[in-house]
Amino acid sequence: ITDMFRLNLDLVEVSGGGGTPNTPVPPTENPNTPEPGTTTGWGFETDPFAEGWTIRDDDGDGYNWEWMDASGSNYNVYEGTHCMASASFQNSPFGGGTALNPDNWLISPAFTAGSTVTFWYAGQDPNYAAETFGVYVIANGTTSDELGHFTASNTYQQGSVDISDFAGQTVQVAFRHYDITDMFRLNLDLVEVSGGG
């Protein structure tokens, strides 16, 4: 996609992480792994990097996923006051701006896979909302094929990917903002992992 603005992604829930671009990160066990029939997740209300979320800027432009605070502003979050966001356009303080070609990865902490990962996402600018992103699982240092490809709108939608093929394994979920330029921001919020059974 091209000529949009930003895709916003908020509340992604999974734990583990750390590493450098293009280097698989061995996951570590999350004590909050969902039990069968239960859900655990992340709403990004506390520092996601302290919780083990990591980011990668594979396009190398210096712009990446950011932890956004909507307190006292009109920033678009699904719930609470925080979300994660990645830009496909960067405003200039002097007017205008720069179209970006993001290939930005947001990678969760490690967790034991259940059946499903759900998340809420939206474009920040209603006129440039069609941000695109893919969702992947990282298991044993190997990144899966894309499990789902999504296009944002100006209102939050719930996305979901089936991770039952990885059930019982220690994994991470990764959100890749890419295949887009010249929109604005992708917002991601409330990521939840459902246990199997």
Whereabouts are the PLM-identified features?
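Extracellular beta-strand-rich recognition modules
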Residues: 1-3, 44, 106-125, 133, ...
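Extracellular carbohydrate recognition
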Residues: 1-11, 99-105, 178-196
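Surface-exposed coil/turn segments at beta-strand junctions on protein surfaces, enriched
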Residues: 2, 101, 112-114, 152-156, ...
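Surface-exposed, low-complexity/disordered Ser/Thr/Gly/Pro/Asn-rich loops and linkers
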Residues: 6-8, 66-110, 125
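Ser/Thr/Gly/Pro-rich low-complexity, disordered linker/stalk segments of secreted
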Residues: 17-35, 197
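Extracellular glycan-recognition surfaces and repeat-rich motifs
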Residues: 35-91
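Conserved aromatic beta-strand anchor motif in extracellular beta-sandwich/beta-rich domains
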Residues: 135-139
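Extracellular carbohydrate recognition and processing domains
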Residues: 140-167
